[in-house]
Amino acid sequence: MAKEVFGIDLGTTNSCIAEISSLDKLPIVIKNSEELQTTPSVVFYDDYGSPIVGGEAKRCMAQDPSRAVAFIKREMSNPSYKRVIGSESISPVKVSAMILKKLVDDANLSREYKGKSKVKDVVITVPAYFGNNERELTKQAGEVAGLNVLALLNEPTAAALSYGTSHLEGKNFMIYDLGGELSM
């Protein structure tokens, strides 16, 4: 049996995880625990200092934004980024790892129900403008989340691959990465 590799879009506003369909070899997004294809890239710390990740975190953020972390990808290589919520020291790697873990935990629940193996090997997308430092920190976040990060892929390249170039042989096409940073 071939090794299963999963694709993760660790987005600024929303994130998702996908697998390749065994039927038609096309990517399929694995729904999260709320049966949605994307998970908000938000972490909220409750009254006890415990992190909540995803949709619930985004809803809680509306009530108390001071205990929430969003848009963390923008801070990935900012050495002066310092944030403490309660007694918890926040770092971009730590928050990104929590988001990745939420995606994988939800995917594993869905896969376990279907008798499939757990998510372990992944490729994570990163903005094309990310330098070596941001890429290394993103890889570290994946490792902190317990993943084997096989590669980091530029987001526009991932979009082109996801769109599927096989049916466009001999034709020109363009991928424009508008991003989602303003869609929160």
Which residues does each PLM region occupy?
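N-terminal phosphate-binding loop and flanking beta/alpha elements of the actin-like ATPase fold
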Residues: M1-P40, Y45-Y176, G180
